[in-house]
Amino acid sequence: MTQKAVVMARGLGTRMQREAEGVELSEEHLRAARAGQKALMPLLGRPMLDYVVDSLLQAGLRHVCLVIAPEADAMRQAARRISAVAGARIECAVQQEPRGTADAVLAAEDFAAGDTFVVCNGDNLYPSAALGQLARLQDGDCRVVGFDRDGLLRHSNIAPERIKAFAAMTVAEDGRLTGIVEKPPDVERYVRDGHLWVNMNLYRFAPAIFDACRSIKPDPVRHELELTAAVAELVRRGKPAFRVVFSEDGVLDLTSRSDIPAAERALADRRLSF
């Protein structure tokens, strides 16, 4: 069973900092938005991070590492607070520069310490079924959760035009991941048997991911070390095996200011364990 989780929370939050026409926010929301602090965005009186960590804890992932910026003292304080009240181990790893998601995972190598671990975003809230399935795995293989496009559109606050901003996947009949492409220009070419499997950065990794992260080069357009490139490298190598966990559930997304009202509506009945 996997008990460790890495939460990528180093992003600059540039889209959250942009004004959103027609969206009325509280002063508390605006302060967090101006700072680009998506993980600390207050939602119904609790920061987004509390919901993210609570989901991990409920899935059995009791040892959590937050990947943060060097100057993110508020995140360090949040980690200490949650550790104290939730009875879990919450620690931080520093990503010195915002060089991309692969670099964020590398920042947590000491935390992983040779164990398998789950990786997720700090500005997404994932379905408990998918998290639990990853946590219960007993093997040493890698997994990525493939979210069905139609399920995302039905059960998330994600608009259809935003699907192209994520990575698309190709999957073999036996469930092996065969390809993953970040922000493809034509997502329809990845539809198979009526499904487009979308990557929302929810993984279960073996330690081999770290060597793959070190082996890649920055994307020539976005100039970042992208985790999808490291995943593609592991798929190319063939070991460890990389399989897809399929989900037709939704993912709560907190990318921009316009997502905040929808996020609060979605969380209206949510009760945290700490």
Annotate each language-model stretch with its function.
Residues 1-35, 41-119, 221:
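Conserved N-terminal catalytic core of the sugar/cofactor nucleotidyltransferase
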Residues 5, 180-274:
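Conserved alpha/beta core of the MobA/IspD/sugar-nucleotide pyrophosphorylase nucleotidyltransferase superfamily
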Residues 16, 75-79, 134, 213, ...:
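Hydrophobic packing residues within well-ordered alpha-helices of enzyme cores
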Residues 39, 89-91, 176-179, 241-243:
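Conserved beta-strand segments of alpha/beta enzyme cores
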Residues 40, 169-171, 244:
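A structural signal for short hydrophobic beta-strand segments in well-ordered beta-sheet cores
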Residues 105-111, 157-163, 258-262:
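Short, surface-exposed amphipathic charged segments that create phosphate/polyanion-binding patches used
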Residues 122-125:
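The conserved acidic donor/metal-binding loop of glycosyltransferases
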Residues 127-212:
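Conserved core of the sugar-phosphate nucleotidyltransferase
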